[in-house]
Structure formats: C-alpha cells, structure tokens
Amino acid sequence: MTIAVGRAPAARGWFDILDDWLKRDRFVFVGWSGLLLFPTAYLALGGWLTGTTFVTSWYTHGIASSYLEGCNFLTAAVSTPADAMGHSLLLLWGPEAQGDFVRWCQLGGLWAFVALHGAFALIGFMLRQFEIARLVGIRPYNAIAFSGPIAVFVSVFLIYPLGQSSWFFAPSFGVAAIFRFLLFLQGFHNWTLNPFHMMGVAGILGGALLCAIHGATVENTLFEDGEQANTFKAFEPTQEEETYSMVTANRFWSQIFGIAFSNKRWLHFFMLFVPVMGLWTSSIGIIGLALNLRAYDFVSQEIRAAEDPEFETFYTKNILLNEGLRAWMAPADQPHENFVFPEEVLPRGNAL
C-alpha cells in the first residue's frame, strides 16, 4: 500500500487570478507594469494630439500653436502654462480652471497633463522591461539603460522648471518649441560650455560611433555560409555556431588602432555604458541649470576684452551672442513682462 503525503493546494485568491491574466501569453504582453504604462501613455499621447490640433497658446505665450490656427507638424506644440500659474499641478477640478475644460486648456493645463502622464508612462515602460526580463530569466540591463532617457525627460521637463519660477520655463511639447528651449538654455545658461553638456555630447555621439563601428565590423566578418548576394538568409536564430569571426575583427582593429576589444562581454558593456553615462551626465547638468549654477566663466578674458578693443576670443564672442539671445528673446518669449530694452544696452562686439 502506498501512502502519499502532500500539502493541500492553497486557495487561489483574486490576486492570483489577476496575476495569471496579466501575465498570459498574448501578442502584446500586459503584465503589472502595463497597468501603469498603457493608461498613462494613452493619455499623454492623446493629450498631445489634442493640444497640437486644437489648443491655442495665445493666453500663455501670445502665439499660435495648433493645426487649427495654421501651424504644421514642426511648429505646432502643447505649450507650457502661463507664468502666473507658478508650479500648480493645474488639475481640471482645481482652483484655476474650476472644472471648465476650455479655461483649463487656455491656462496650459494640457502641458501639465502630458508632462506628468508622460513621465509615468516612461517609468511604466522601464518597469515593463524589468518585469519581462524577470519572467524570461535574463538580466535587467535594458531597463537600466532606459533609465537614461527617463533621467533626461524628468530633469528637463520637470526638475528644471521646478528650479525656475514656474512651469512656463519648461520646454513646450513640439519640434520648434524644443529648438526655442535650446536657444533659451544657451542664452541664459551658456549651456554648450557646461562640462556636463560636453560629457553628454561625448556619450551620445560616442555611442553612435560605437554602434556604427560595431555594426560595420560584424558585417565585415560574417562567415561566408551562403551562395546568395548577401548572407542574411543564411542565419538561423537557433544556430549553435558563431555567425561572425571575433578573432578576425580583433585582428583588424589591432592593426587599425594597435588595440582592440578581445572580449565580447566587455565590448557590449562598453557600448551600453557610453551612451547611458552621456544621458545621465547631461541630466545632472540640467539639474545644475535648474539651480542657476554657473560653469566655466572665464572672467579674466571678459575683463581684458572690455579693456582692449583688439582682444577677442571665441569665448568672449559667445558671451556677446548670449547677451544678444537674452536681449532679443526675453521680450518675445515673455510678453507678459513687457520688457523694453533701449538700443544702448543691446550687445555690440569689439569690432563695432
């Protein structure tokens, strides 16, 4: 006689049933992260499409910003709230709009709506990568890498305006609007001379260079395992053998530079590290701008340029350009301040 000793199956509650449904194998995986990702991404994208299509920026920036007013894809935008709104969350039912949807749009409520839902959507997408990596049984480096774009978005769209007087000084959601924000950062913060911006540029362009070099090197060293014009069809995702020669690639770059990667794992970690560090460092720099921190003020050159009409450097020329950006941008960018700059205070280079 056989006696089976076992544990009675635990009763399945609503959490287990929901967990099974969320993690069911389907074309688009949902998961627990999807409860955050899909609603927030849908609302952020919908708010942006609504704003760029219908909503004016006349009451916040004194400009047209929608397709309805004649803008195109490059010039339409969801503009930041009015300067007078400060750092209000601009809830539809809050004291500013008092439930009036049209008034809420006029005050810039859609920008706050898109920015906050967009931030949570990006966080949800990173959590999605964590969740699927855990289910598949791989390490979560994709999610860690995606923290770079999240850091940039949060620092630029949320932390920077929080350090300034209001949401008004954040970037509006549009192509030309982002360009205006870049000019603003240069004119008011001398952003291109900031070392964190330099590290960010080095990281992003360095990552692009590494990507191009890596792709070209792999294509160069593919094994000739087919008779067709290209070898793409000769590859099978489940094949055991290598599809390109790391030894040949190492030999090639050793001859080019005298040094080359000999370890695929170190090579690919480096390709991950360079662009992500670029994104992180540029985010740190933006946080510095939020606090109005200065970087690289070469005062001695400015003093000498002021005293000697024949002395000028690229730095002093850029400082004059920044003064021009501030003097010409501020009246157009902040019409509510009624700035008026007389001719004698506008910047003039030494050559003039």
UniProtKB/Swiss-Prot annotation:
It is found in: Plastid, Organellar chromatophore thylakoid membrane. InterPro entries: D1/D2 (IPR055266), Photo_II_D1/D2_sf (IPR036854), Photo_RC_L/M (IPR000484), Photo_RC_L/M_CS (IPR055265), PSII_PsbD/D2 (IPR005868). Chlorophyll a ChlzD2 binds at H117. It is a multi-pass membrane protein. It is an enzyme of class 1 (oxidoreductase). Keywords: Chlorophyll, Chromophore, Electron transport, Iron, Magnesium, Membrane, Metal-binding, Organellar chromatophore, Oxidoreductase, Photosynthesis, Photosystem II, Plastid, Thylakoid, Transmembrane, Transmembrane helix, Transport. GO terms for biological process: photosynthetic electron transport in photosystem II. Its main location: plastid. PSII is composed of 1 copy each of membrane proteins PsbA, PsbB, PsbC, PsbD, PsbE, PsbF, PsbH, PsbI, PsbJ, PsbK, PsbL, PsbM, PsbT, PsbX, PsbY, PsbZ, Psb30/Ycf12, at least 3 peripheral proteins of the oxygen-evolving complex and a large number of cofactors. It forms dimeric complexes. This is Photosystem II D2 protein. It comes from Paulinella chromatophora. The lineage of its organism: Eukaryota, Sar, Rhizaria, Cercozoa, Imbricatea.
